[in-house]
Every structure is written in C-alpha cells, then in structure tokens.
C-alpha cells in the first residue's frame, strides 16, 4: 500500500462510496457537492489516498494551518479495507507531514461513531470538546487533538 496525493478528478469520484457509509449517509451528505469539495481540496494538494494495486482503499482530506496545527477534515476507508491498517497509515502520513511544522493534529468525529472514538484514542488523540451543530443541527461532533511528540 502506498500513500499519495490525488488529482482533482480522481478525488471527485470517491464521493459516491463515501456518502454511502456512516456517518455521512445518515447526515444526508450527497455525492455531487461532496465530490466538488473533494476536487477543490485536491487542487490545493490536501487529499491523500491509500492505494493498493491501483485501487483506492481510503482517503484523508486535510486543512493545514488551523490553530497551530492541521485539521483532518475527512477520513474514509472503504468497507472492504476496514481493519487492514488503511486509516492508521493515512493518519500516520498526515502526522508525519504536519508535525514537521505544526504542534497539533486535530480531527472531529460524530459522537455516535464509537468506532471512530476508539480509533482516535488508540492513535493517541485526546478528546477536547463536544461541538453541537458543527456539521448537522441535530448531531454532536467530538473534537480530538494530538500533540507533536
């Protein structure tokens, strides 16, 4: 598996499988607007993909230079690749790139997504806030952060 930057057209095409998964499905995310956003972020060099044999297994989208750190705006792993270290590898790459210049790495997760909470805790993130209405009016996001070693 390799981690590489993604071109805008390829980033846009990932939206279909992302919106079919939780938590994006129950939050009402739609493929076309998400695809446009992914394409814009890719043009800015902010989309990385985990690739194996030319297949994208997962992607991470970052927003650099946020609050003395980098914010992981989206992390998604294809269901068939879950549990194979794809998410861990993507976060590790973002950590490496971010911690070279920044003090913090941030991410948020839906408070209902207990698997995400376990995942981020296991990677050394600490929960720092609950943010009602950040992504959807009826949902609560949990803000996580990790300090540069």
Model-derived regions, located:
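Acetyl-CoA-dependent GNAT
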Residues: 5-74, 78, 91-93, 97, ...
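Short hydrophobic/aromatic beta-strand or adjacent loop that forms the aromatic wall/cage
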Residues: 45, 139-143
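Active-site acidic-Proline motif in GNAT/NAT acetyltransferases
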Residues: 64, 78-80, 84, 111-112
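Conserved acetyl-CoA-binding loop-helix of GNAT-fold acetyltransferases
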Residues: 77, 83-96, 118-122
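Conserved GNAT acetyl-CoA-binding A-motif
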Residues: 98-109
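Conserved beta-strand-loop-alpha-helix junction that forms the acyl-donor binding cleft
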Residues: 107-117, 133-139
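Conserved acetyl-CoA-binding loop of GNAT-fold acetyltransferases
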Residues: 121-130
